[in-house]
Amino acid sequence: MLEVTATDTAALTGSSPSSQARRYQAKGLVDEYAHDDAVRLLLGTVATTAARLDKVVTPLLALFDGHHVRISLLVQTSKSEATAIGKSIGWRVRCEDVPYRFVQHPDPEALKHASGPMWIGPMWHKEIAGRMTEERALELCHPNPEDIEKGRNAGLVWGDDDIEHSAREVRRGVRYIAEAADLMSRDHLLLSLDALPRLCKVGGAPKMEKLLTALTAAGHNAARYPDLEPMLVTDAPFDAVVQVVQATSTSSDRRVE
C-alpha cells in the first residue's frame, strides 16, 4: 500500500503553469475538470515513477480534497505490467461534440485543448471504495459515548456541539464515495452540474437528485461525485445525458439558438 498526499494544488491543477511544467512536465487547462486533472496527474506521476522500478500501481481511491490531493494505491512488482504502463497514460482533450475524450497521443491541434499527460485508467477500486459509507466511517472514526466520557474524565472539554461537529466532519469526509465507487472503477463520464446549461443548451442546471433519478430511470448508472463543486459521474453516453437534461428542463428553460 502506498498513500500519497500532495499540497501543491496550483501546480497540479495548472493554475500555476510554470510550476506544473517544472514539477510534473505537464500542461493543464483551468476549467471544471481541473480538480480531476490534478488527481490524474498525480496518479500518472506516481505510476510512471513506479514503472521505472518495475512496479505497477492499482488505484484504490483518489480524491481532490480541499487544498490537497490524496491517492491510495496498491503497489506490486511486475515487469510486464510496468512495461505496459503507457496504455494508462494519456491526455484529456476538450471536444466540440462531447465534453472531453481521453487519447494517448493528441495531434498538434488537439493539444491546444488538452491537459496531460495524466492517468487515464480506472480511478478507484470498486469493493474497497464501496465500503466507505458514512455509517462505517462513524463506526470506525467517531468516538462512542464511553470514549467521550473517559476523555472528559481525563480533562477533555467537549460539549454536545463538539460531538455533533465531529460526526458531521466524519460524514463529510466520505460523503458520496460509496455511491460512486462502481462508476469510478471503470470507464465513466464526469460532468459539472454548473456546465450542463452550456453543454445542453438549456437555461438552467437541473437539480442534482432530479438528474440522477432521470438518468437511472433511463437505464444508466449515475451518482454524485465527491468534489468541492457539484459534479456527477455516469456511464451514459453524452448524447443521452443531453436528452435527459433537456427533458427535465421546462420549455422556458430552453435556450433559443
Predicted segments, located by residue:
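SAM-dependent transferase fold signal centered on methyltransferase-like domains
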Residues: 1-257
